[in-house]
């Protein structure tokens, strides 16, 4: 029995924080839910659509269990103020939002992310901006387009795109461009 399994079986523990490598998150989340633990997980919660469906199914079968993820920009004082001003209409009728997220790319091109069999800058970094815009607009995207490249990481161990541009069109008609 590994240390994480003994933690999950400990009846005195009500909540677990999952901060392992991305490719372990889904399995650990599912095990935690099955063992009656509330979950706070680093993102991404999972790497595949099938993993997402399994997490959703497991949580539905254990609907008293709560799952939360580390979408930290929502608690940043600058964005809390922006959201309040946004809701008051202080920016007029919004038709377009643009955001850039500097995620410390250089350091991550050589760390554990570069050695993974799969790493997504969308799930690991850009998700912060996607979540923030969805939160500001209180709307879901209906159209998503993404283009990326690996030019900046060509001489590194990183095997996947380290840059992406995301275009989102929301149900309320607003368009967002995120990098």
PLM region spans:
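Active-site beta-strand termini and strand-to-loop segments that position acidic
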Residues: 159-161, 166-172
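Hydrophobic residues in well-ordered beta-strands that form the structural core
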Residues: 41, 47-48, 67-69, 98, ...
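Beta-loop-alpha module in the N-terminal Rossmann-like domain of NAD(P)-dependent dehydrogenases
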Residues: 1-58
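Predominantly a Rossmann-like dinucleotide-binding segment in NAD(P)-dependent oxidoreductases
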Residues: 73-158
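Acidic-histidine catalytic/liganding microenvironments
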Residues: 10-11, 62, 76
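Short, well-ordered coil/turn residues at beta-beta hairpins
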Residues: 18-20, 136, 170, 174, ...
């Amino acid at each position: 029995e590994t240390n994480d399994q003994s933690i999950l079986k400990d009846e005195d523990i009500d909540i677990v924080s999952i901060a392992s490598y991305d490719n372990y998150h889904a399995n650990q989340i599912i095990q935690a839910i099955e063992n009656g633990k509330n979950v706070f997980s680093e993102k991404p919660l999972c790497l595949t659509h099938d993993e997402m469906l399994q997490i959703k199914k497991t949580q539905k079968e254990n609907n008293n269990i709560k799952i939360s993820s580390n979408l930290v920009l929502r608690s940043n004082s600058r964005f809390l103020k922006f959201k309040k001003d946004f809701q008051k209409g202080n920016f007029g009728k919004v038709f377009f939002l643009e955001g850039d997220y500097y995620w410390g790319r250089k350091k991550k091109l050589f760390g554990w992310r570069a050695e993974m069999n799969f790493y997504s800058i969308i799930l690991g970094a850009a998700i912060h901006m996607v979540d923030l815009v969805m939160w500001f607009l209180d709307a879901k995207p209906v159209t998503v387009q993404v283009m990326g490249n690996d030019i900046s990481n060509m001489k590194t161990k990183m095997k996947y795109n380290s840059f992406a541009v995301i275009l989102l069109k929301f149900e309320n008609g607003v368009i967002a461009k995120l990098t």
